[in-house]
């Protein structure tokens, strides 16, 4: 039996809508994505194999939402939203079901194939980036994200963008992927968010000196770099730039 036939037949025997269900199972085994009680959003969820797996893993206390332009046949324990994942109206429907802060966002989307590899790769990266941007709008701090993309020259840039927002990112190729497939999965763990926003005016204590001579302040565990400030000072600052891991601020008390 071929590799393809094994997972196809296995999915039929075990009641999954697609062989892709086993890809999510492996991603979950390796990166611990799905837990009892978690909220999960699947982008591009039709026909629903990943929804079935997610529903099994989060159980009755969890929430699973599938989003797709196509109608998704009912899956036990799953709510579905028909719409474009990039539309704010669609995101609002997701939030109404899953809450404002989702634990996990996954996407197994693939573009309509042209047979021209460079085109298919570019379209795949575009879809993955749209899924990533949607995930940033709905994920909770500490949340996880997994997305399919075709290997190629643009993957590294996409991965770097994702790495900027999460504690770490792994590249995985599940056993259930076809031997001829170029698909890989980027699995990002631990969404990072800043406790401050641009324009905030706050009082901070300078606790260290950075390599460039700037003062270093901490807001919770978040680092702010403050020029013209010395260790031991308590100063009022305005936040001027915010990144996931650190930010910059200017003194307002001089």
Region spans (language model):
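SAM-dependent transferase fold signal centered on methyltransferase-like domains
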Residues: 1-254
């Amino acid at each position: 039996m071929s590799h393809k036939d094994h997972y196809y037949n296995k999915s039929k025997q075990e009641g999954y809508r697609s062989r892709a269900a086993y890809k999510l199972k492996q991603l979950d085994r390796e990166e611990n994505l799905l837990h009892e009680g978690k909220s999960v959003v699947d982008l591009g969820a039709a026909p629903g194999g990943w929804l079935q797996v997610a529903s099994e893993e989060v159980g009755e206390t969890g929430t699973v939402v599938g989003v797709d332009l196509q109608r998704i046949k009912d899956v036990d324990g799953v709510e579905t939203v028909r719409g474009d994942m990039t539309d704010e109206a669609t995101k609002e429907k997701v939030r109404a079901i899953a809450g404002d802060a989702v634990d996990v966002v996954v996407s197994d989307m693939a573009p309509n194939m042209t047979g021209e590899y460079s085109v298919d790769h570019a379209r795949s990266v575009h879809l993955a980036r749209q899924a990533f941007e949607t995930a940033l709008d709905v994920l909770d701090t500490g949340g996880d994200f997994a997305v399919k993309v075709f290997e190629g020259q643009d993957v590294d840039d996409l991965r770097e963008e994702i790495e900027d927002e999460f504690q770490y990112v792994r590249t995985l190729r599940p056993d259930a992927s076809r031997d001829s497939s170029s698909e890989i999965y980027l699995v990002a763990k631990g969404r990072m968010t800043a406790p401050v926003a641009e324009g905030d005016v706050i009082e901070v204590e300078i606790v260290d000196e950075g390599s460039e001579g700037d003062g270093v302040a901490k807001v919770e565990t978040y680092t702010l770099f403050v020029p013209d400030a010395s260790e031991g000072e308590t100063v009022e600052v305005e936040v001027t730039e915010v990144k996931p891991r650190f930010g910059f601020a200017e003194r307002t008390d001089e």
